[in-house]
């Protein structure tokens, strides 16, 4: 008789222990993974920003005698870029940007690693926006010079970085 009560007591105790045992909740693991993703996204944005700034600073170098020629080429900017998916518009213009940089190479002006910069920018853009290329860019009616083009994308990156949670 006592063995039956003891067995019931042990069973109830085990049930209580199992149900009250702390476990990792799905929200805490998803929160930590989303935090890691946000940090990685922040790092990619900062890398993109640095690459664009470095490219712009090399182009604006006082010894760049080819800059007036580079300013004749026109680039298109999105009407309103506010989200990471809008980086598709930047990716669409990387080919023409590479062409302009290749055309303006000379002995007096070398954009060392221009191809490397474009490649890094392309890889970073794909990491940020994803590999989905189905988004069609709505370009602004007015074109921009290469300097304005880079400045606008730099401002875009700074805006996204400043509004993202730290």
Swiss-Prot record:
Location(s) in or outside the cell: Secreted
Coiled-coil residue windows: none
Signal sequence, renumbered to the chain: 1-20
GO molecular function: cytokine activity; growth factor activity; interleukin-2 receptor binding
Sugar-modified residues: 23
Statement: the UniProt record of this protein carries the keyword Glycosyltransferase: no
Keyword Hydrolase part of the UniProt annotation: no
Record-annotated disulphide pairs: 89-137
GO biological process: adaptive immune response
InterPro entries: 4_helix_cytokine-like_core, IL-2, IL-2_CS
Xref: SMART domains: IL2
SUPFAM superfamilies xrefs: 4-helical cytokines (SSF47266)
GO cellular component, as recorded: extracellular space
Keywords: Adaptive immunity, Cytokine, Disulfide bond, Glycoprotein, Growth factor, Immunity, Secreted, Signal
Family: Belongs to the IL-2 family.
Protein role: Cytokine produced by activated CD4-positive helper T-cells and to a lesser extend activated CD8-positive T-cells and natural killer (NK) cells that plays pivotal roles in the immune response and tolerance. Binds to a receptor complex composed of either the high-affinity trimeric IL-2R (IL2RA/CD25, IL2RB/CD122 and IL2RG/CD132) or the low-affinity dimeric IL-2R (IL2RB and IL2RG). Interaction with the receptor leads to oligomerization and conformation changes in the IL-2R subunits resulting in downstream signaling starting with phosphorylation of JAK1 and JAK3.
Designated name of the protein: Interleukin-2
């Amino acid at each position: 008789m006592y063995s039956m009560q003891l067995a019931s007591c042990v069973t109830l105790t085990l049930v209580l222990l199992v149900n009250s045992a702390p476990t990792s909740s799905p929200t805490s693991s998803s929160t930590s993974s989303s935090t890691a993703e946000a940090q990685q996204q922040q790092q990619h944005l900062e890398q993109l920003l640095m690459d664009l700034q470095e490219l712009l600073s090399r182009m604006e170098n006082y010894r760049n005698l080819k800059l007036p020629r580079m300013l004749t080429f026109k680039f298109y900017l999105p009407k309103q870029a506010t989200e990471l998916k809008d980086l598709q518009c930047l990716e669409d213009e990387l080919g023409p940007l590479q062409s302009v940089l290749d055309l303006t190479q000379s002995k007096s002006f070398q954009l060392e690693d221009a191809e490397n910069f474009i490649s890094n920018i392309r890889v970073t853009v794909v990491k940020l926006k994803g590999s989905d290329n189905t988004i069609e860019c709505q370009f602004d009616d007015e074109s921009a010079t290469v300097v304005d083009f880079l400045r606008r994308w730099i401002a875009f990156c700074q805006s996204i970085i400043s509004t993202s949670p730290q």
